[in-house]
Regions:
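Terminal helix-to-tail segments of small alpha-helical proteins
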Residues: 9, 18, 59-67, 124
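Residues that scaffold the ATP/ADP-binding catalytic core of kinase and kinase-like folds
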Residues: 14-16, 50, 122
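Short helix-capping/linker segments at secondary-structure and domain boundaries
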Residues: 16-22, 53-57, 105-113
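Metal-dependent nucleic-acid phosphoesterase active-site entry motif
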Residues: 1-20
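Active-site neighborhoods of divalent-metal-dependent phosphate/nucleic-acid chemistry enzymes
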Residues: 71-112, 117
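Acidic, PIN/NYN-like endoribonuclease modules and their adjacent C-terminal/linker elements
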Residues: 2-4, 107-136
């Protein structure tokens, strides 16, 4: 089991929105990877936007309960994040994805819960697969 579970906006939205295609998958993953789940502010911004006014209270509750925790400070890792975004400009890599990949480089035993497939393309420390769990 991973020591640091990271979540992207896709997982959060899938978990909180019954209308999301990946909702059953996210609900099944949640107990297997118990909170707290680490994330970054960029991923939260995406999640709040995608959830809209109906889903925002549920995400706010996760934050208040500290089930989802921001453990990343962009200012401290700005150059590394910008370098990742430049490297993967053809994908393209979002700010949230770059922050999460950087988190996998700095946190011990990380895994990302994500509904996306881009993390299969990205590499941590330039050559290592980013550990992630996806719906496949």
């Amino acid at each position: 089991m991973a020591g640091n579970v990271l979540v992207d906006a896709g997982f959060v939205v899938a978990l909180l929105s019954r209308r999301d295609t990946h909702h059953p998958w996210a609900v099944a993953q949640a107990p297997q990877f118990a909170p707290p789940w680490n994330t970054c502010e960029a991923a939260l911004s995406e999640a709040f936007h995608l959830l809209g006014t109906h889903g925002a209270p549920a995400l706010s509750a996760l934050l208040r309960r500290r089930s989802v925790v921001v453990v990343f400070e962009l200012a401290a890792d700005l150059e590394s994040v910008l370098m990742l975004m430049r490297k993967y400009v053809s994908v393209p890599m979002s700010l949230a994805d770059a922050c999460l990949v950087r988190m996998t480089e700095t946190l011990a035993d990380p895994v990302i819960l994500t509904t996306g497939t881009d993390f299969r393309i990205y590499r941590r420390h330039s050559r290592h697969v980013v550990p992630c769990v996806t719906p496949d």
